[in-house]
Amino acid sequence: MAYVFNLSCLGSQVERLLEARSSRPTWIIQPSPKKAPEACFSFHSSYERNWA
């Protein structure tokens, strides 16, 4: 299940990156809450802590 969740997180990040190229260069500093839920960030941070 985590793998599927990870893919959905990646998809939202790519989507924001595409938006940023045309309108919002600060997408990393100010992510859209709608497209980047806190659960996604906490998942990635815990993944990096355990495996990076």
Curated annotation (Swiss-Prot):
Phylogenetic placement of the source organism: Eukaryota, Metazoa, Chordata, Craniata, Vertebrata
Superkingdom in the source lineage: Eukaryota
Reported tissue expression: Testis.
Name listed for the protein in its UniProt record: Putative uncharacterized protein encoded by LINC00308
Source organism of this protein record: Homo sapiens
